[in-house]
From Swiss-Prot:
It comes from the Eukaryota. The gene is LMBRD1. This is Lysosomal cobalamin transport escort protein LMBD1. It comes from Homo sapiens. N-glycosylated. The lineage of its organism: Eukaryota, Metazoa, Chordata, Craniata, Vertebrata. The chain crosses the membrane at residues 11-31, 51-71, 101-121, 145-165, 189-209, 306-326, 365-385, 409-429, 487-507. Keywords: Cell membrane, Cobalamin, Cobalt, Cytoplasmic vesicle, Developmental protein, Endocytosis, Endoplasmic reticulum, Gastrulation, Glycoprotein, Host-virus interaction, Lysosome, Membrane, Phosphoprotein, Transmembrane, Transmembrane helix, Transport.
């Protein structure tokens, strides 16, 4: 009875923390979506869909520290299991986490392959005023059916794809791999779900390489460099207006005597008049920003922004160094591409892999660090998306602007962030493989010692950090790790993706260093949906 009560207490602690994270996530998603959605084109359904899909992704990531916490707290620091942690209780705890993953991953599949596409196509059809609601729903369902078919194919392939590994590899290593995956289960339903989620994670990896890697270098450098002075930009703009007005006056003077203008002059006049309208619109925006209290407040916070920029670039360098050492470890010590570069433990230590187990001894510091890492990925991804925009090959589909993002763009944004957040679980594993696999678990090993006072040798049990050499019944592997490595070919793709991530980060760092300061109205003159009577994207 006492054993059951202690186990329940441990579960309550873990899930209470998860509940607090859940509330924080919902609040963050609401603020985040409301900040970027268009004030003029705000739609209730698209807003709720965006908030819900982003929240589901973040909640799934929040399961990672819960998973690690539960497997770690089943054991004492001396390597022994706690009194309540017998085989049945341990299995019950592991199944609880597994069912949590089942539920959340199923909801993610529903969002990605049905709900988000349906809402997106519904609003695409809504732009046509002549279309009835019934027709809009039918058309949206017709297009969504294609996504449902893709999901069904992924589930079928995942359920029956062979997982046989090459026979020319070390048999001991593969026995260990097989025994680990047997813990996760061998049902076709689980394999289908794992394959589908891994496919989405692979797309998330491509999004992370495109947006997160660039944003990780662009965000801190933009904070450090700041923006150009509104007063100086306004002075330059005034000079440009005077110059364009002189050109217009010169061209118009040619027709004072009643002679018609040549075709070339007409084209030039039209271009100058269009340029003048743009410059006057910029003048209004710059005047508003120069006189706003928000600009003065941001100017007072300039030193703080520089400090944050330096902090973010140091964090980025910490991540890059940890990721490089982890990938180098796999390149040197894993079984190769046919095994998905799976490696047990860490032969080359990296800063984060050493830091996280230490923080876990002081609850809940590791939760805080994992949350910071996930939020850092979110903010840098958003910075990358804002700088690059949403593209389909060479065609720019949408721009993300504060207070001016259309419902369709908002759905695209949350879809990309959902996929990136899915990939963060593997990124965290890449940064701290030992922590994600075993947490802070220890196990006991027998060591022979020789004593001068007593003849012969004696045996002493000493704790050791859990690794691949530990007996199967002494260390519990997290469910997260098993989900991530169910299919070796995805692990191989993630490995090469990490190298691409490092390369894009370095390229982005060079590009961001070479770029000058941004305009205070960056992107305003590009936005076709800005009316002349609206002062600025920063007016909110």
């Amino acid at each position: 009875m006492a054993t059951s009560g202690a186990a329940s207490a441990e579960l309550v602690i873990g899930w209470c923390i998860f509940g607090l994270l859940l509330l924080a996530i919902l609040a963050f998603c609401w603020i985040y979506v409301r900040k970027y959605q268009s004030r003029r084109e705000s739609e209730v359904v698209s807003t709720i869909t965006a908030i819900f899909s982003l929240a589901i992704a973040l909640i799934t990531s929040a399961l990672l520290p819960v998973d690690i916490f539960l497997v770690s707290y089943m054991k004492n620091q001396n390597g022994t299991f706690k009194d309540w942690a017998n085989a049945n209780v341990s299995r019950q705890i592991e199944d609880t986490v597994l069912y949590g993953y089942y539920t959340l991953y199923s909801v993610i599949l529903f969002c990605v392959f049905f709900w988000i596409p349906f809402v997106y196509f519904y609003y695409e059809e809504k732009d046509d005023d002549d279309t009835s609601k019934c027709t809009q729903i039918k058309t949206a369902l017709k297009y969504t059916l294609g996504f449902v078919v893709i999901c069904a194919l992924l589930l079928l392939v995942g359920a029956f794809v062979p997982l046989n590994v090459p026979n020319n590899k070390n048999s001991t290593e593969w026995e260990k791999v097989k025994s680990l995956f047997e813990e996760l289960g061998s049902s076709h339903g689980l394999a289908a779900l794992s394959f589908s989620i891994s496919s989405l994670t692979l797309i998330g990896m491509l999004a992370a390489i495109t947006y997160t890697a660039y944003g990780m270098s662009a965000l801190p450098l933009n904070l450090i460099k700041g923006t150009r002075s509104a007063a100086y930009e306004r002075l330059e703009n005034t000079e440009d207006i005077e110059e364009v007005e002189q050109h217009i006056q010169t061209i118009k003077s040619k027709s004072k005597d009643g002679r018609p203008l040549p075709a070339r002059d007409k084209r030039a006049l039209k271009q100058f008049e269009e340029r003048l309208r743009t410059l006057k619109k910029r003048e209004r925006h710059l005047e508003f920003i120069e006189n706003s209290w928000w600009t003065k407040f941001c100017g007072a916070l300039r030193p703080l922004k520089i400090v944050w920029g330096i902090f973010f670039i140091l964090v980025a360098l910490l991540f890059v160094i940890s990721l490089f050492l982890s990938n180098l470890d796999k390149a040197l010590h894993s079984a190769g591409i046919d095994s998905g570069f799976i490696i047990f433990g860490a032969n080359l230590s990296n800063p984060l892999n050493m830091l996280l187990p230490l923080l876990q001894t002081v609850f809940p510091l590791d939760y805080i660090l994992i949350t910071i890492i996930i939020m850092y990925f979110i903010f840098t991804s958003m910075a990358g998306i804002r700088n690059i925009g949403i593209w389909f090959f060479w065609i720019r589909l949408y721009k993300i602007r504060r207070g001016r993002t259309r419902p369709q763009a908002l759905l695209f944004l949350c879809m990309i962030l959902l996929l990136i957040v899915l990939h963060t679980s593997y990124m965290i594993y890449s940064l701290a493989p030992q922590y994600v696999m075993y947490g802070s678990q220890n196990y006991l090993i027998e060591t022979n010692i020789t004593s001068d006072n007593h003849k012969g040798n004696s045996t002493l049990s000493v704790p050791k950090r859990c690794d691949a050499d530990a007996p199967e019944d002494q260390c519990t592997v997290t469910r997260t790790y098993l989900f991530l490595h169910k299919f070796w070919f995805f692990s191989a793709a993630y490995y090469f993706g990490n190298w691409a991530f490092l390369g894009v980060f370095l390229i982005g760092l060079i590009v961001s260093c070479c770029k000058g300061k941004k305009s205070v109205i960056e992107g305003v003159d590009e936005d076709s949906d800005i009316s002349d009577d609206e002062p600025s994207v920063y007016s909110a």
